[in-house]
Curated annotation (Swiss-Prot):
One of its GO terms (molecular function) is alpha-1,3-mannosyltransferase activity. Residues 617-659 are annotated as: Disordered. InterPro entries: Alpha_mannosyltransferase (IPR022751), Nucleotide-diphossugar_trans (IPR029044). It is a single-pass type II membrane protein. Responsible for addition of the terminal mannose residues to the outer chain of core N-linked polysaccharides and to O-linked mannotriose. Implicated in late Golgi modifications. Belongs to the MNN1/MNT family. This is Putative alpha-1,3-mannosyltransferase MNN15. It is found in: Golgi apparatus membrane. Its EC number is 2.4.1.-. Pfam families: Mannosyl_trans3 (PF11051).
Amino acid sequence: MRFTLKKIFFVFLTLLIISIGYLLLQSVDLQRIRELLHDSEKFDLESLKQASLEIRKEIHYTNYLFSGYDNFTQQFSDEETLKQTSLNDKCKLVFTQWKESHPDFEFKTFEPEYERYDKSSDRKELFFKERINQLRKRFEKDSNNKNKQFTLSRQDNKTISQEYMEHVNRSKNVLQFMADFVSMMRLYGKCFFGRELDDELKSIYNEFRGKLFPFISSQAPKFRKSGETEEFGWPIYDNENNIIDRKTEFGDNPIEFLQKNSKGKGIVISVSTRYAKDAMRLIKILRALNNRLPIQIIYKNDITKKNIELLEFAAVATPEELFDPETIRDGAKFMPELNLLEHYKNYGSEFPIQDLTFVNIAGCVSRPYRFSFPGYSNKILAMLYSSFEEIILFDADVVPTVNPQEFFDSKYYKSSGTYFFQDRSLRDFNDFIETNFFSTLFPSNEKSIETIFDIPRVGEKTFNNKYMTGWRHYQEAGVVAYNKMQHFLGILMMFPLALWSEPVQSSIWGDKEMYWLGLSMAGDENYEFNKYAAASVGEKTTEQKYKYYPNSDSNEVCSTHPGHIDDNGRLLWINSGFSYCKKNGYFRDKGKFPFSTFELNDLVELYNSPIKIRAGLVPPDLPNQREPGSPPDTKPEMEFRKSWKSRKKDTDEINEKLPEGQEPYDFISEWGPQKGWVKNGICSGYYYCAYDKITSYSSEKEFDTGTLFEFDTKSCELYDYLSKIWHTGGSKMKPKVKLETEKLGTGSDKEQXKDATTVRLRI
């Protein structure tokens, strides 16, 4: 057979076309067929839940490894060589490597929504539900689909699944960055804090200060003593606690400056004009309790001149001036039988002049972050920028009922350099994704960069606390006693928590959990909480006709005020001032039980009077909702929450979804309380009733029990006295004064009082 050139050409062309067609089939049709053959993804609810479980296992904190771990360990031939290497050499290596491998490393806030950690990353079924609802709404909105039924195609499911995995991968990357960032902070503390540094380490120390803490500027706060006009810089002390210099700038490394130049003990209050009235009341309460600790008011150019004058007046005026009928006429109606001017000495009050300093930190935050610290986060700035080494941080609206020195003298503070207080044990729960997130920020894994650098790992104390075992509320931060130098890294750890928008902001309530979280993130578990959780303080309900569970033998204390009681049954402080209800007047609540049974005049008098503290009730603690260690399998906690539905309903639940025509329940006679804290609509929802005997969550016993504290007559008289002080303490009247400067010596904190000059204001 002869092959002509023409035939050869056609054969070649045919083979080429077949080859191209085959390749196209391979890349398109066969690829599509291959995809279909391998497309086994299921989208039923159980399959989605199983996929969620696999994701939770994948993102579990035990799988976290510092990004620089392998690069670092590869520089050592064996484990023994690594152990023999000095801390200085390890520090130089780890920071140099990190700089080389991450040249653009800097703090990130993750503020834009498209950058954020997605808390639905472990809930594929929830993600699908939300996206399907969006598709359905879009379908129904389209006028062309009026008579059509919404259906979800397999391709729709696949698109949602792909989008879900994009969110998961983004969240993984964000979590890795955040955990790496916190690891770098721990290494920074280990390598540089409290150590003698050579020039190379000093250079690294200063360089990474800017990378880790770019929000801290080099400008020092401006200090001004009460009654003076001159502002001065940060006080520098010698070894005998004499002030030898003032600094208006922190120098090359503000972190080093702040750590080395904080001295003395004192009270710190973050105040703006919004909270100035509460702060005036607090200062007068402190004087009634004979406080002799110096006070620093931390602000950011956000207190008016008038309010500054009123705060100064509260701090230095004589009792005659404080309780002058013209000054306190708004508060004179409260307990008229108690004449403060005649009786204050009967309560042991000396009303010492307060050593008050205003600390303006407006310039201390770098310009790009000036508006990144609103509200509660100002308290974290106040901790850092107070010049005290040991602080009691007060919210402006708290009321201490003991001399503040007692917080420093407590066994908890003496043993740990901290004294924290527990919140109410409300039955509000958190989710796996939240506790697992925070666990990833803790040093907890054996295979870790922290182990190599001998940084302590956290254990049962952290993982077994109330928050980490599934409950939303653990710490109440109205009062925090804190030794800054002993726990300096813990303060710094709070800043990324305050600046990262998600998942932090939706996982904790303001700053409340940040104090113990910051310490655990630092690998520092040397912190202590008060023995008892928060109590409901007020009057025990004694008349059956006013009780929400009239046939129960559980004690009941209803109040808008949580209080905090020490091991010996003494009330230490309360939240939210002394008003019976500061959110609204009686008018909104007059139709709500038990006030619906009151005579109107009696209700008006109740709302216009301070709360009477006669008892404090601490409800029983809750069992773990989640086992320690954030187990990826959430079925046990879901089953536990499901079991609540089989319990009888409390007054905050029983009126939900009532059958049409059925009268709502004011109270429940047939059974007793099921929860220790039952929320009420009174006072805009700030009113809670506490119970010390509830149906047990355990099948092994009938009841869980708490503790009722009934205060003695002397204590109750003191609380009434303090309530009168508080109600007369927030006058907005601008006093007519002349200034007389005099030397102030408190006698208790020598280092704070040596150069202290104050003023006495005369009406």
